[in-house]
Regions:
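Bacterial N-terminal signal peptides
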Residues: 8-16
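Immediate post-signal-peptide N-terminus of mature secreted/exported proteins
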Residues: 21-62
C-alpha cells in the first residue's frame, strides 16, 4: 500500500458518495475513504449544529449518542483499517509517526472544511437541518452500513 492510496482516503472524504463513485475507481482505499468520510461528515454536522444552533444540542446529543452506539463496531473497524493502511505504507516507526500525523491531520482538515461549508449555509436552512437531526439520525440515510453497502463489501474482502 503506498502513500497515494492513503491520500485517497482524505480525498474521497471531501467528495460526496455519488461524486466519489463517479470520479474514482473502486478500490479498497477509495471505498474505505468513502465510508470513513461518511462518518466524518456526520461528526461535522454535529459540530456545526452545536456551534450554530446550540438550542438543538441536548436533543442532538442524545440522538447522536444513540447513532454512535449503533455504529460503534463499524467505526472501530474503519479506524483500525485506516491505521493499518498507514502502518503498511510506512517504512519504519519514525515514518509511521509522521504518516499518522499527516493523514489524521488531512482527515480532520476535510471534516473542518465540511463543517465550515455547513456553517456557511443560510441560518434558516442550517437551523432546520439541525432541528431535524434527531429524526435524520434514525433514518436510512444515516445508516452507514446501508448507505455504503457496496463499499463495505469491498472493504470486508480484506481482513
Amino acid at each position: 500500500m503506498n502513500r497515494s492510496s492513503l491520500l485517497s482516503i482524505a480525498t474521497a472524504m471531501a467528495l460526496s458518495g455519488a461524486a466519489a463513485a463517479a470520479q474514482a475507481p473502486d478500490s479498497y482505499a477509495t471505498d474505505l475513504g468513502r465510508v470513513y468520510g461518511g462518518y466524518q461528515r456526520m461528526l461535522a454536522m454535529k459540530e456545526a449544529c452545536d456551534t450554530a444552533v446550540p438550542a438543538t444540542r441536548a436533543a442532538n446529543d442524545k440522538a447522536f449518542a444513540a447513532w454512535q452506539a449503533q455504529h460503534r463496531t463499524l467505526v472501530q473497524d474503519l479506524q483500525r483499517r485506516v491505521t493499518a493502511m498507514i502502518l503498511a505504507a510506512s517504512t519504519d516507526k519514525d515514518d509511521y509517526v509522521r504518516n499518522i500525523g499527516q493523514y489524521e491531520g488531512a482527515i480532520l482538515l476535510q471534516r473542518k472544511e465540511y463543517r465550515d461549508t455547513l456553517l456557511g449555509l443560510g441560518q434558516e436552512e442550517l437551523r432546520e437541518q439541525c432541528r431535524r437531526m434527531p429524526e435524520a439520525l434514525t433514518g436510512p440515510g444515516a445508516d452507514l452500513a446501508q448507505v455504503y453497502s457496496a463499499e463495505l463489501a469491498t472493504i470486508r474482502k480484506r481482513k
